Amino acid sequence: MKVDAQILYDTLHEVPHLVQAAEAWGLDAVWFSETAHDPFLAAVLAAQSTSRIAIGTAIALAFTRSPTLLAYLAWDLAALSRGRFMLGLGTQVRAHIVRRFGMPWAPPAPRMRTTVRAVRAVWDAWHSGAPLDFRGQDMTLSLMTPFFTPPPQPHAIPIFTAGVNPPLCRVAGEVADGFHVHPFHTPAYLRDVVLPAITRGREKAQRTSGPFEIVVSAFTVIDGTEVSADAARRALAFYASTPSYRGVLAHHGWEDLGQRLSVLASRGRWAEMSTLITDDVLHAFAVVAPREEFGNKLRERYRGLADRISIYEPFAPSQAALYRTLIAAVRT
């Protein structure tokens, strides 16, 4: 397995130092999420500040940007990074798309399928010089003149999609080059639900022979400290309160937990939510281990399930020893 890092930052000024540290330690990739910042701006700084490490968005919101805009962003980043950029796309949930971004909502799986195919159609037009002619569900792209065509660049751009439930997993298998497993997962859910759905998508699209990477971000509780355990419980409670993620809980017979957490969240009783995350739930969703055993336990947990692994906690230069231990264990 490859070892990646999730990069979080308060200001863009921090990005070069963080990604240079990740590259110096031998990590394989850095990923930028779309929470309080635009991940593409951070990816530009990462590309300019490094020479080897791969750079990706995990994830950028697909439904708040047009496919053509996504195509331009990824094309320029692939050129700037000399082929190190990976485009990771996700859906978010309806409330954020409609109420935070003011954009229309549509069924996410068909829309993601159309978005990825449209991005590839734009790239194909730029590569070949042929007229742009994409006709998908609720979308047509038919205008691309030489004036608006960027200079050629030789690098392939892998597209990763993300999701939790089977429909988006199947779409990833149909149209993507890899899949970001949501941090709110268990190995059982990954093995029993996510991977079979991806396989069905790949079989449907007759894409079973090409490469496809499974990217996992894992919750961790290292050395059993209360601070670490409480942080994991808070994050798990937040995700478990989201109705869209209820299927993961249902796979373990914990539907009632999700319903109770949703009620608390709707009433703003955030401080109480983490108390509902029992030790059994914590151990199902998180890697709980002493520091010296952490790398080996992570490797065994995801052996045969993942191709790339990172830990959910934000990357920090103070974690050098932890990441070196992780790299040594996971790559053996």
Could you say what each language-model-derived stretch is?
Residues 1-332:
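Active-site-adjacent structural elements that line small-molecule/cofactor binding pockets in enzymes
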